């Protein structure tokens, strides 16, 4: 929404209207897409483009797409790389098999919900549906808290458990670069599935954490540690140490997807230093990672201080 407003587009949002506010000039339609007649507010409207981020029951995407079938020429569905069926080989592209899903399905697990949402959007809009399989999303406004956790931890200073190797490539997309690509390609009428995330190695764990030290002005010392002792201590990649997935891990493919199709379609990713600096600026403005409005709470990410201290104490001097 912020990128569309920045472009001076006429923007309409559809939601229940019980959380947050919308920028001046944005028209809000109220409704509950899971309720009977909950899409009534869409009746009679016409738009140039729809962007749907729904991650619940696929039938809600189906119903919204059907309600908008004659009101909009193009449907953008923000999906996820989680739709791919395990095991996923590193380097896989959009042709990789997806998890079993049903366009008419009720709320299930996240991969099936997103895969079902893709089926629903495609059933109604065909090749006029753009399926953006986003990867790890970082940047200002991140309400999961992965990069904010690292920034807050580094800002506290002292020895920081830095999961290695330092040159481990990471794969993510800045939310603003994702938004730009979605609106550009949506306006052009592009359809089909795309892995929308930066190239593996656009940045490394070292680049990310060095940038965190720089922007916070912290006296933190990054204690780079090989994966083996970290994993042996029961630390979970991705959750306990956000962003980090070491080589050889079953979910390493999340950091090694083929994204050349999205790049050929104009994806441009800003430097990691900009993403980190702008996220820190936003985090200082809001004070803490905001609650996920209208969505189930997620388990907190990041190691507890006492657990990190114990791990650091066990490392060789």
Segments predicted by a language model, with ranges:
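Conserved sequence/active-site signature of Rossmann-fold short-chain dehydrogenase/reductase
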Residues: 83, 137, 201
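Conserved beta-loop-beta element that borders a ligand/cofactor-binding pocket
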Residues: 117-141
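Substrate-positioning beta->alpha
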Residues: 144-150, 163-188, 192-195, 207, ...
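N-terminal Rossmann/SDR dinucleotide-binding element
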Residues: 1-53
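A short C-terminal helix-loop "cap" of Rossmann-like NAD(P)-dependent dehydrogenase/epimerase domains
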Residues: 151-163, 218
């Amino acid at each position: 929404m912020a990128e569309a407003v920045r472009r001076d587009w006429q923007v309409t949002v559809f939601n229940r209207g019980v959380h947050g506010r919308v920028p001046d000039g944005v028209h809000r339609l109220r409704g509950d897409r899971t309720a009977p007649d909950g899409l009534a507010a869409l009746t009679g409207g016409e738009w140039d483009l729809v962007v749907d981020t729904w991650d619940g029951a696929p039938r809600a995407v189906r119903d919204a797409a059907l309600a908008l079938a004659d009101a909009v020429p193009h449907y953008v569905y923000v999906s996820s790389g989680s739709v791919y069926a395990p095991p996923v080989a590193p380097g896989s592209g959009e042709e990789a098999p997806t998890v079993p899903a049903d366009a008419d399905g009720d709320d299930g697990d996240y991969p099936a919900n997103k895969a079902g949402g893709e089926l629903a959007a495609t059933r109604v809009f065909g090749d006029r549906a753009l399926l953006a399989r986003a990867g790890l999303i970082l940047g200002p406004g991140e309400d999961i808290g992965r990069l904010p956790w690292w920034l807050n931890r580094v800002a506290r200073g002292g020895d920081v458990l830095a999961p290695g190797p330092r040159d481990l490539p990471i794969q993510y997309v800045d939310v603003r670069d994702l938004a730009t690509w979605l609106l550009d390609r949506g306006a052009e009428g592009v359809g089909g599935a795309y892995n929308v995330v930066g190239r593996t190695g656009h940045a490394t764990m070292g680049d990310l954490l060095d940038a965190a030290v720089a922007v916070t002005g912290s006296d933190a010392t990054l204690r780079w540690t090989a994966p083996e002792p970290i994993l042996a201590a029961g630390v979970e990649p991705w959750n306990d140490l956000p962003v980090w997935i070491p080589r050889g891990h079953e979910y390493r493919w999340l950091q090694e997807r083929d994204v050349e199709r999205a790049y050929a379609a104009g994806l441009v990713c800003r430097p990691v230093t900009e993403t980190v600096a702008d996220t820190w600026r936003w985090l200082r403005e809001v004070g803490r990672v905001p609650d996920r409005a209208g969505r189930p709470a997620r388990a907190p990410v990041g190691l507890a201080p006492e657990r990190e201290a114990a791990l650091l104490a066990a490392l060789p001097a």
